């Protein structure tokens, strides 16, 4: 559900 965040794992 991420991927769009630079600091959060995909």
UniProtKB/Swiss-Prot annotation:
Gene Ontology biological process terms, A to Z: regulation of blood pressure
Keyword hit for Secreted: yes
Cell compartments where the protein resides: Secreted
Residue positions where Pyrrolidone carboxylic acid is found in the record: 1
Subcellular location, principal: secreted
GO molecular function: peptidase inhibitor activity; toxin activity
Reported tissue expression: Expressed by the venom gland.
Keywords, alphabetical: Hypotensive agent, Metalloenzyme inhibitor, Metalloprotease inhibitor, Protease inhibitor, Pyrrolidone carboxylic acid, Secreted, Toxin
Family in the record: Belongs to the bradykinin-potentiating peptide family.
Name the record gives this protein: Bradykinin-potentiating peptide S5,1
């Amino acid at each position: 559900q991420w991927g769009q965040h630079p600091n959060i794992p995909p």
